[in-house]
Regions:
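Short helix-loop "hinge" at the ATP-lid/N-box region of the Bergerat-fold HATPase_c
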Residues: 41-42
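Conserved micro-motifs of the catalytic ATP-binding
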Residues: 21-25
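Short alpha-helical Gxxx[C/S/T] motif in the catalytic ATP-binding
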Residues: 103, 108, 112
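Short conserved segment of the HATPase_c
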Residues: 79-93
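Disordered, acidic interdomain junction associated with two-component signaling
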Residues: 6, 33-36, 82, 138-169
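Glycine-rich G1-box
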Residues: 2, 77-78
Length: 169
């Protein structure tokens, strides 16, 4: 966020059509993936650029499953067609012109792809050299069908103690 603020990069976040709020999956993996994608969106953006992030639920044919779609679109420098072929390979970096000024190990995208695939998801992208990149990540999640029951139990007690109450008279 600090680098985005210094470069005056605007970040817009939109949650659309999310039905199920309690899902079973790996929040740590999702966080790591999104951090890698957003880090690149900021790092390879332009001053006064823009990053658009969205999250949308895509219903599944299986009643206990759903898919979350994350989109990250930036107005950055984009990727050459040649680099797009190897963006998910370890240590791959684009070394053309001003790109060499961007520090990195070339591991962020391969790690993100591996984590997404471990969760049973997919990652695709479109990029235009000089115009920006859009990543689309789809990850399946199991719906926590028991969350409603746990919520009902919480509502019954309301967190109030029965200490000192005369229940049986």
């Amino acid at each position: 966020e600090q680098i985005a603020a210094e470069q005056n990069i605007q970040i817009e976040w939109e949650k659309k059509e999310i039905i199920h709020r309690n899902l079973i999956g790996s929040p740590g993996y999702v966080k790591r993936v999104m951090m890698n994608i957003l880090s690149n969106a900021v790092k390879y953006n332009r001053a006064n650029g823009h990053i658009y992030i969205s999250c949308m639920e895509i219903p599944s044919e299986q009643p206990e499953m759903t898919t979350m779609e994350f989109v990250c679109r930036d107005t950055g420098i984009g990727m050459t067609e040649e680099f797009q072929k190897c963006v998910f390979e370890p240590f791959a970096q684009e070394h053309t012109g001003s790109r060499t000024k961007f520090a990195g190990t070339g591991l962020g995208m391969p790690i993100a792809k591996k984590l997404i695939e471990t969760m049973g998801g997919t990652i695709t992208f479109e990029s235009e050299n000089g115009a920006g990149t859009t990543f689309v990540i789809r990850i399946p999640f199991k719906i926590d069908l028991n969350s409603d029951k746990r919520e009902e139990k919480k509502d019954v007690s309301d967190g109030k103690s029965i200490k000192g109450m005369h229940i049986l008279r």
